[in-house]
Amino acid sequence: MDYTVLDNSALFSGIPTKELCNDLNTVPHHIQRYDKGETIFHLMENASRIGIVLEGNVQAQKPFPNGSQINVSVRKAGELIGAAAAFSRSQKYPCDVVALESATIMFFLREDILLLLQKDLRIMKNFISELATASFMLQQRLELLSYNGIAQKAAFYLLIQARQSGKNVIKIPGSVSNWAMIMNVSRSSLHRELKKLEADGLIAYAPPVIEIHDFDALQNVLSK
């Protein structure tokens, strides 16, 4: 395999390709392809595997008995899937993970990822950082989903991104359709609310970016 595809993975940040290749060649793993819509991990399945997305985008989805579903997160190439579940007390996947398009995943068994972490302290530090980041992002995700209005969800997302980046120009995550999916709303409804925010002078809506014009007014949207 061409391991250069992992150069952009946060898990292997700071590790030269040659060293990474040597590490991976001594630890069992396998690579599997999935078609669009195919399930990678099933809800409450034994979390014995950890994956790294090599190609494509995958989504964690939380289904409910009444037929509704929450789109929890999207993972793209270079990102981990299943890591927190594999090392949790329950060792069960809390969501379905589904391929949004053709996807390729590198899998490690839980015991084998531990071997990899022991081999290279840099990978261990990166792994801990990834778990902490995922936990922080989940907290933000839960807060976003706590808002009922679409304008509130959009305002919260834009303000969080602006605070983290220190910029007032925010890049839309992938596309408006993808952004809508992340926020669990329809594309048309999100587009309509963004146009309203633009008409009110709060933002400039010009996909693939949005420029925030009035931070205070956008903050006030959250309390409506």
Show the residue positions of the predicted features.
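Phosphate-/nucleic-acid-contacting segments
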Residues: 161-224
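Cyclic-nucleotide recognition modules
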Residues: 71-129
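Glycine- and acidic-residue-biased ligand/ion/polar-headgroup-sensing regions
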Residues: 37, 48-61, 77-78
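Short, small/polar residue-rich loop motifs at catalytic or cofactor-binding pockets
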Residues: 26-27, 45-47
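A short beta-strand-loop-beta hairpin characteristic of the jelly-roll/cupin
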Residues: 58-71
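Polybasic "coupling" helices that flank or enter modular domains
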Residues: 100-101, 118-184
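Cyclic nucleotide-binding regulatory module and flanking cytosolic helices
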Residues: 1-36, 81, 85-88
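Short phosphate-coordinating micro-motif centered on Lys-Gly-acidic
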Residues: 39-45
